[in-house]
Amino acid sequence: MSDTTLSLLSPEKRKALEFAISQIERSFGKGSIMRLGDATSMKVETISSGALTLDLALGGGLPKGRIIEIYGPESSGKTTLALHAIAEVQKAGGVAAFVDAEHALDPTYAAALRVDIQNLLVAQPDTGEAALEIVDQLVRSTAVDIIVVDSVAALVPRAEIEGDMGESHVGLQARLMSQALRKINGNISKTGCTVIFLNQLRQKIGLTYGNPETTTGGVALKFYASVRLDIRRVQTLKKGTEEFGIRAKVKVAKNKVAPPFRIAEFDIIFGKGIANLGCILDMAEEVGVITRKGAWYSYNGENLAQGRDNTINYMEENPSFAQEIEQQVRQRFDQRVALSANTAAYTEEEIGEGE
C-alpha cells in the first residue's frame, strides 16, 4: 500500500491498520506481514538446474524456498536433472539431501555428475510417512539447501505395506501427500530450502477425450508446487549405430515466479549427464553473443572453431572462456526481461491515462 493510498485512509482506519499489523508481528514475528512495496528484495533467488537453456526458460533457475515437481516417463532424465541441481547447490557451498524412496540411487553416476557423494545426505525410508517426516525435519533444521525426493510413486503408505497383497487402499497416498505438503509448505518458505519431488506418469483408465496422462500422488502436489517441469525424451543421440545420449525436452507446465509454458531442450550424455556447454553455445548464438557463418563460429570477430562439436571442445578446453560466454548470455537475457517489463509497465500507464 503506497503512501498515497495510506493518505486517503481516515485517521481511525490508519490507526486500526497499524495496530493490527503490530499485533500480528508481535504474535508471529517481524516480517510475518508487510506491505509488498516495502519488501527489500522482490526478486526470487534461484539455483542453477545445470542446463542454461532450462535456467533461462525458468526465468533464471530453480527458485529457492519453493516446492518443485519434475515428472515424465521412464528414462527421460528426471533423476539426472535433480542430481545436477544438487551438484550446483554443493558447488556453491550448500548442503543437499536425497530421499531415495525407490532405493535406486547410483553413487557412481552421481559422482560422474560432480555430486559430492561424501557429503550428500541420503535416506532410504521404508514407508511414505517416514520419507515425508524426514523431509519435514530436514527442512525445519534450516541447515539443508535442497532436498530431492525420488519418487512420489514410491512413497507407499504404511497401511499398504503392512496390509495384504491385493488389498484396496483407495486414495491413501493422495491423503498422505496432502497432509504432508500442508505441513511442509510453510517451513519451506521460511527456511529457503528447495524441495524437488520426482514423479512418474500413469494412464487414466477409460478416458475418451483429453490428455490420458496423469501423475501419481493426487492433486496436492500440483497445487503446492511453484514450478512443474514436464521432461520428455525426444531423440536418441547416435554416432553411427552406437547410442551415446538422448535429447531431452522440458516444458515448464507451471511457474509461479516467472512466465510459464516455456520450452527448453538439452542433451544428456550417458555417464556424463547434461551437456551444458552445448546449451551455452546454443543460447549464445540465439542472443548474438556468438555468431555463425556457415560452419564457423566466431566471437568478437575472431573465429573459434569449425562445426558445433569442435566449438564445444574449444569451450571445454577453455573453461574461463565458457564461463565468460555464459555470464554474457545471462546478462543479455536479464536485459531482455527488464526491457519487456518496462514496456509492459509503460503500456499500462498509457492505458491508465487513456481512461
Curated annotation (Swiss-Prot):
The keyword RNA-binding does not apply. It is found in: Cytoplasm. GO terms for biological process: DNA recombination; DNA repair; SOS response. SMART domains: AAA. Its main location: cytoplasm. ATP binds at G72, P73, E74, S75, S76, G77, K78, T79. One of its GO terms (molecular function) is ATP hydrolysis activity. One of its GO terms (cellular component) is cytosol. Keywords: ATP-binding, Cytoplasm, DNA damage, DNA recombination, DNA repair, DNA-binding, Nucleotide-binding, SOS response. Disulfide bonds: none annotated. It comes from the Bacteria. Belongs to the RecA family. PANTHER family: MITOCHONDRIAL DNA REPAIR PROTEIN RECA HOMOLOG-RELATED (PTHR45900:SF1), RECA (PTHR45900). Can catalyze the hydrolysis of ATP in the presence of single-stranded DNA, the ATP-dependent uptake of single-stranded DNA by duplex DNA, and the ATP-dependent hybridization of homologous single-stranded DNAs. It interacts with LexA causing its activation and leading to its autocatalytic cleavage. HAMAP family: RecA. This is Protein RecA. It comes from Thermosynechococcus vestitus (strain NIES-2133 / IAM M-273 / BP-1). The gene is recA.
